[in-house]
């Protein structure tokens, strides 16, 4: 049965009375891990580990010198909490009652995991945004309740380091999931409306060995939720979808986002060091052991042949004795190989942690471009059910960041600034200032999941601008 044509979205300032619109999920503010926030988002050329994957998908395949084994894995958990949301979306506060959007209305959670094998990397990062609006009408009970929105983007990434890891290319699949439900509690007892969208992403970094500079670029094509998974909200005769007293949009869109970045490192600390595995460092000694094993195998075959040639009633017993003798030699060679690799691993690890100069001064710069979104309003416009079109023009955000280890082996500091252009015609760009730090903590192998020398760090960052303030927290490894 065909769905009746829905009403068109009205002019700016009018009440939303139709589902024939989209939410522009573009972010003007920097939302990411503490390092990315502290650098004001200028991390496209510095992306590494889970913390860099949201800026540049090639981060999944970056192999740093801190882990000299053939494999590596990264686990991360970051949170961003806007503690001052007077104008979170830089909309100019021209719609609705800003008191309805409390300081605890918006929250971001970013967990992720990467696994790397030689120069290949795969990973998953989840970028989740939680929004709650108090005072929505539950159509079942006709009582005031809390309308909750979840915008979750799953980044499934893979990448490879070419030219011995100097040219890193990565890409992947993005899954955008929008969930809408009425509940006074954060866990959902059932979604009123849920949609899904699929998209792609691509990133590249060029980090020439021993050079002070690096380059990066990333592209995230437009992503839109077009697959409706569930709809328990009521539907009007015009085909509009209503949850409580809210007209829900037919889709959520993230515009095309492109970034280019550049970084330069000053100081004595080695820049863009190549990744060296323990096997590479011990290659000559391991080759000698391999030669010993091949020679022993030849000797074993010759000796068994001589025993068979002599013959006699106990020939099989003699052959087994020969095999046992050489089995002990092979076990000794295998043990020596393991000891050599462990020694090389410890040497590389110790050299990186203690032998390298710690002082460095890192400058980074990015230029991010956000594309247009047709027939869309901002999240705030949806919250207040008042039309304020968003994404009608392309926006450009220049960003610059600085990082240094101000207290060797104890603390890193970073800071930066970026311009946030508005996605709305009624507002203007604003200037952000950011500050972040890493603090070295304690050693803990997490019940054997990490090496005994693994030392943890606490990371934090703040971001201030007109009518906006946010802080980010995270935990990870100190290197």
Residue spans of the language-model regions?
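Subset of outer-membrane beta-barrel
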Residues: 9-479
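Sec/Tat signal peptide C-region and signal peptidase I cleavage site
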Residues: 3-7
